Amino acid sequence: PAIPRFPRHISYDLVLFGSWRRKGVYIGDGRQIASPGSYPVAGFNFAPMYNLGYKFRVGASLDGVYDGSANVYTYMEDYIVDSNGNGTPPPRQFLKPGIQHQLSLGVSGRAEYVMPYFTIGVGIGANVLGRGDLRGLYQILALKIGITRSTFLHIGYNLQNFQTPNYLMLGLGFRFHNKYPK
């Protein structure tokens, strides 16, 4: 049978995701220690994607993230040591900044390879709003698993500055204006 001509079009992907992460915190002398708990991560991606053919999509994405571990810092109270060097340091406290230091909004370029039940996507972007830990470039690798014609499971990973593991993305996606042939 003949393969019908592909109708090039723009579709819109909306992904809502959540996750958790652990974090290392710098303690001043360049060393890191593990923060004692895990932190929530939640976000969204809104991506208009140009469908070039049966196998390839490209587009841009608006990416919003709440990262509960962003800009966490450690604090230790001063303590007195006697002349013999005796003294017990108090435990370190891990402090979270206000929510304005844990939100970011970024823009990324995306490319996706489309298969019958799966789509593999990559992206690179930069946060345009975000403070401290949330500044800089980020990279995304994602797997979309089709559930219905317009919904999919989204499993992805986010790196920061091509080296630092950031967070896992586990979510649900919706595709609007999908003219992909049935």
What kind of feature is each model-predicted range?
Residues 1, 165-182:
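Outer-membrane beta-barrel "beta-signal"
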Residues 16-22, 64-68, 115-117, 124-130, ...:
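Transmembrane beta-strands of outer-membrane beta-barrel pores
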Residues 16-18, 44-50, 107-113, 141-147, ...:
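Residues on the lipid-exposed face of transmembrane beta-strands in outer-membrane beta-barrel proteins
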Residues 11-15, 57-59, 110, 119-121, ...:
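Residue-level detector of the transmembrane beta-barrel scaffold of outer-membrane proteins
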Residues 20-45:
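Surface-exposed strand-loop-strand hairpins of Gram-negative outer-membrane beta-barrel proteins
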Residues 55-58, 115-120, 145-155, 178-182:
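Repeated loop/turn-to-beta-strand initiation elements of outer-membrane beta-barrel proteins
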Residues 26-35, 68-99:
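Flexible, solvent-exposed loop segments that connect beta-strands
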Residues 8-10, 38-44, 101-105, 114, ...:
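Residues that define the transmembrane beta-barrel architecture of outer-membrane proteins
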